Every structure is written in C-alpha cells, then in structure tokens.
Amino acid sequence: MISQILMIFTLISIWLSLAWGLVILISAVQFWLKHSDFRVDTSPLLYYPKVTIVVPAHNEDVVIAQTAKAILDMNYPHDRVELLLFADNCSDRTYEECLAVKALPEYAGRDVTIIDRTGTGGKAGVLNDALKMATGDYICVYDADAMPEKNALYFLVKEVLKDPERHVASFGRNKTRNANQNFLTRCINQEIVVTQRVHHVGMWNLFKIGRIPGTNFI
C-alpha cells in the first residue's frame, strides 16, 4: 500500500514538474516574441555614475589577469571606475598577478586597489569588506574567472538609470568562457544558457521575479 502511494506521488511530482517547465517555456517564448524588435543602443548616457567593481579571487592566478584586463578595458569612462581586486587567502600567485596588471603602462593612473586579504567569510566576507571601502555610487561584482564584454558595465548602468528610484539592481546574462573546449564545457554552457534565457526570462515574464546571479550585476 505504501509503495503504491509513493509511486503515485512520484508520478504526480514528475508530471507537475514537466507541466511547470512547459509553462515557463511558453512564457519565455512569449517574452522573446514580444521583444523581437529589440535593437541594441549604445548611445552615450547623459550621466555616468561612478562604479566600484569588486572582484573576489581565491587562488585564481590562472585567470585573474585576463579578468582584470577585461574589466579595465570596458567601454565606460575610466575616471568613473574604481576596481577593487581581493586576493582572498591565496596560496598561489593571485596577488602578484594583480600587481602585474596594475603596473602595465596602459593602466597607469587607473583607480585600482589590490587587497591581500586574510580575513574569514569567503566571498561574502570580501563583499562586506568592499562595501566599507567602495567610493562609487554603485557596486558591481564580477567573479575572478569572468571576462565581461566591452559594453557589459554600460548596459548594467543604463538599465538602472532608467528609473533609479525603483531599480536598485541590474544584472546581465552569463555564458561559459571556454564553451567550445570540450563536451563537458559545452554541456555546462548549455545549462547556463537555458537557465538564463528560458527559466529566468519565463519567471520574469510571469511574475516579474528576477534572480541576481553571483557575477555581472550592480
């Protein structure tokens, strides 16, 4: 008797999950059809608020230099960007890699601060420390293995400035950095793309619920 009840419960759960997934998919399709005429606009903003970009890094010496360079090369006024690079309890060369990037001639005069952190709390601890140090109007967070596109920060700020009294956060889509490296990375990238472009979009279209990721947001 108990096994039969469990079987029925399992079947109902599976069908409900499939039905809910179908609802989200239809909602996402509706959203994309509604915005099919969207065109990218990169016209200059009337105002560029200062943004403090925080990058928590724990033993990321393989990728941190590329990430820091990508951030410093973004299409946003250089004097309106403060970059805080946290080498959080690192046992590798993350801190030295950050120093090397800051010393490059093309980044001379840029507002870059490198912190060799020994505190506790991991990423949450880093963000709490950064909050006390930040001098920008907004705080933007990127993971150490992120490589933001040129206009990433521009679009985040632009979205918030549409209604700064109501829009307290803005986030962008992410994709796998090395998506085409092998079968596993392609699968990971596909999972991220489906989650962000179907599930997140469907939830937003239905309930105006957005889920802020851990990177690429202000």
Which residues make up each language-model segment?
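Long helical/loop segments within the catalytic core of UDP-sugar-dependent glycosyltransferases
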Residues: 30, 102, 106-109, 116-132, ...
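N-terminal membrane-anchoring/stem segments of glycan-assembly enzymes
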Residues: 1-47
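A conserved acidic beta->alpha catalytic loop
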Residues: 78, 87-96, 119-120
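Acidic helix N-cap motif at the loop->helix transition within catalytic regions
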Residues: 65, 92-101, 151
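Short, acidic, metal-binding catalytic loop of nucleotide-sugar glycosyltransferases
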Residues: 69-80
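Short aromatic/hydrophobic "clamp" motif used to bind/position activated sugar donors
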Residues: 139
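Cell-envelope/extracellular polymer assembly enzymes that use nucleotide-activated donors
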Residues: 49-52, 82
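The conserved acidic donor/metal-binding loop of glycosyltransferases
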Residues: 143-147
